[in-house]
């Protein structure tokens, strides 16, 4: 998606979603033995990022891929704010509490498989 049109159209039909999913699953990355097709994202993670809209005036969120301590692929979310001079969405971070008294990212996702819906049409 081009940043000039960001965010653009955010809803797609199930048929389009199925086609995109099929393309991914047929790609070299999607065919890999340890391929992750989706992520289960707890509402708590999404709500934490959405709260950044008020506190940090974010325009968007960015998801980074990583591997956690359990060896699972995961997504880590950060807020992003558009730099009007450059047009680039820059990551912004909120300070954590207690043990996380530093810039924080939001996690909690689980890879699919194994945490997927076996009956999904996507």
Identify the role of each PLM range:
Residues 1-122:
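Detector for the mature cores of small, proteolytically processed
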């Amino acid at each position: 998606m081009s940043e000039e049109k960001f965010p653009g159209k955010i809803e797609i039909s199930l048929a389009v979603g199925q086609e995109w999913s099929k393309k991914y699953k047929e790609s070299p990355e999607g065919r890999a033995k340890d391929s992750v097709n989706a992520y289960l994202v707890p509402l708590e993670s999404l709500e934490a990022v959405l709260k950044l809209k008020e506190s940090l005036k974010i325009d968007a969120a960015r998801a980074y891929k990583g591997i956690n301590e359990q060896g699972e692929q995961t997504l880590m979310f950060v807020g992003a704010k558009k730099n009007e001079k450059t047009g680039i969405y820059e990551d912004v971070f909120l300070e954590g509490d207690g043990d996380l008294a530093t810039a924080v990212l939001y996690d909690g996702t689980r890879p699919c498989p194994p945490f997927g819906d076996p009956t999904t049409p996507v």
